[in-house]
Amino acid sequence: MARTAGLREPAAPLEKTPLETYVPPAKPSLIGLSRAELAARLGDVGVPERQQKMRVQQLWHWIYFRGARSFDEMSSVSKDTRTALAERFTVDRPEVVAEQISNDGTRKWLLRLPSGDDLQKAHEVECVYIPETDRGTLCVSSQVGCTLNCAFCHTGTQRLVRNLTAGEIVGQVMVARDRLNDWADRETPHGNRLITNIVMMGMGEPLYNFDAVRDALLIVSDNEGIGISRRRITLSTSGVVPNIKRAGEEIGVMLAISLHAVRDELRDELVPLNRKYPIAELLQACRDYPGASNARRITFEYVMLKGVNDSLDDARLLVKLLKGIPAKINLIPFNPWPGSAYECSDWEQIEKFSEYVFNAGYSSPVRTPRGRDILAACGQLKSETEKLSARERQALRAMAMTD
């Protein structure tokens, strides 16, 4: 997004810090807790029940509206309460250990988290900010690694390590606001926030971490805090059918489906989850999604793979399958990564595919690849806990030079 003179610029990029410098937090963070949970923590430090509702509102304002980094900043909270909270808790975010900035302005942060095991080894996830003229989109992760093994996705080459907590998911949004100077007391052009949209399209399958994702998104969308509208939050799933309806009922955000194929035999290969929840079952769940309408269309993501799923026959069957579903189709040029077995469809073929779908009555934008040179584009995220080999780094540089 364009910035004007005199406004606070985003913080400078960070250098990667060594894994062994990580020190696990000694105290739990209040980030990610519901109001009821915050009230319980206040009770733990001796705040009388009659004061808890007021104190919760104060904490909520300072943590999620103002982005306070310590209890000392919370000037409207009594000093005794601040001291008691600081002795037991923190408002720490995930640790930012590296930041990369693409030639197109996309930013990728590598975030370090405690592992939750006795060895206290750190885990890492990635979070990506994509600035555009009329919006700023933050791509958020829900798991360390992924269990789905989608054939075209870089994250799928990393084993699932663990689910993220609600606090670690919300923490990604807070880290991004920290790095972009995007809290309520900071100037931004025309009074708008730099982060306007959230997409749960980072590492992991959100619906396999349902409770934490739900709790995090309810906090992110709360009007008295971070305040990002649910209509500006999109949850993307590869098709965990039993939790799709739950997402509509309990979270109420926009839904995106990683479809990528129109025949079960091919989708079984590209998205192995299809063997459990085939296309017909998935699309029925979409038809039943609470709140779906022409004003709240379901997005179907379709990665364009040369000679694999990009024929006009595929386009025709796609249109047929989506009949009766308020939908739009995002066509995604395949973003290569070291060791990937696929090629991106030719641009002419992508345009033909898009034109056919559009003429059938569906919006079919072609997603502009962003952040390819820093492996931040769709399907390219992978925790640096699993290092790239020298050969992979060389391949990445070669691919970036040809874009």
Swiss-Prot record:
Cofactor(s) needed by this chain: [4Fe-4S] cluster
Residues forming the catalytic site: 126 (proton acceptor), 378 (s-methylcysteine intermediate)
Gene Ontology CC terms, in alphabetical order: cytoplasm
Domain Radical SAM core: 132-375
Catalyses which reaction(s): adenosine(2503) in 23S rRNA + 2 reduced [2Fe-2S]-[ferredoxin] + 2 S-adenosyl-L-methionine = 2-methyladenosine(2503) in 23S rRNA + 5'-deoxyadenosine + L-methionine + 2 oxidized [2Fe-2S]-[ferredoxin] + S-adenosyl-L-homocysteine; adenosine(37) in tRNA + 2 reduced [2Fe-2S]-[ferredoxin] + 2 S-adenosyl-L-methionine = 2-methyladenosine(37) in tRNA + 5'-deoxyadenosine + L-methionine + 2 oxidized [2Fe-2S]-[ferredoxin] + S-adenosyl-L-homocysteine
Disulfide bonds: 139-378
Cofactor comment: Binds 1 [4Fe-4S] cluster. The cluster is coordinated with 3 cysteines and an exchangeable S-adenosyl-L-methionine.
Keywords from the UniProt entry: 4Fe-4S, Cytoplasm, Disulfide bond, Iron, Iron-sulfur, Metal-binding, Methyltransferase, rRNA processing, S-adenosyl-L-methionine, Transferase, tRNA processing
Main location: cytoplasm
Superkingdom of source: Bacteria
Tagged with keyword tRNA processing: yes
Single Gene Ontology MF annotation: tRNA binding
Enzyme class (EC, first level): transferase
Family: Belongs to the radical SAM superfamily. RlmN family.
Extra information: Reaction proceeds by a ping-pong mechanism involving intermediate methylation of a conserved cysteine residue.
PANTHER family: 23S RRNA METHYLTRANSFERASE (PTHR30544), RADICAL SAM CORE DOMAIN-CONTAINING PROTEIN (PTHR30544:SF5)
Protein name, UniProt field: Dual-specificity RNA methyltransferase RlmN
Species assigned in the record: Bradyrhizobium sp. (strain BTAi1 / ATCC BAA-1182)
Gene from which the chain derives: rlmN
